């Protein structure tokens, strides 16, 4: 969901040019399309995004300028690939960019929960991606 929201928002920017990629930290859903409730939620909010699940790896860390994680488990898994301070400095919790001062830096995983949980996550993601874009434009 975060990739869908961010990709749609940065597509409207003339500069800087931003490439949005998404990968899971496990191989559970590799090759599959988006989770139906997640896709339904972002489409209802006006976002479009095509996605096939893939797994994060060291090459992606090296290629990225910024790696956004959703929770502590994601952070731990992504950090396993870090071989330098430069690579470590690329990793941020998405909600670090939420200027409303969230109670937690973690975005909960709504998988297997009702649509209302996906809508709550969408709201968190929208706030955080707005803050991220503000930072990109500085």
Enumerate the predicted regions with their spans.
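Short polar/charged helix/loop
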Residues: 1-138
């Amino acid at each position: 969901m975060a990739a869908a929201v961010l990709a749609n928002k940065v597509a409207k920017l003339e500069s800087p040019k931003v490439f949005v990629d998404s990968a899971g930290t496990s191989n559970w859903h590799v090759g599959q399309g988006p989770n139906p409730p997640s896709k339904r939620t972002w489409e209802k909010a006006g976002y479009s995004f095509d996605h096939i699940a893939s797994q994060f790896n060291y090459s992606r860390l090296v290629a990225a300028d910024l790696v956004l994680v959703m929770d502590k488990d994601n952070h731990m898994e992504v950090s396993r690939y870090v071989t330098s301070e430069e690579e470590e400095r690329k990793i941020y919790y998405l909600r670090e960019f939420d200027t409303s001062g969230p109670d937690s830096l973690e975005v909960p995983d709504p998988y297997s929960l009702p649509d209302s949980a996906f809508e709550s996550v969408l709201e968190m993601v929208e706030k955080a991606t707005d803050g991220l874009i503000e930072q990109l434009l500085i």
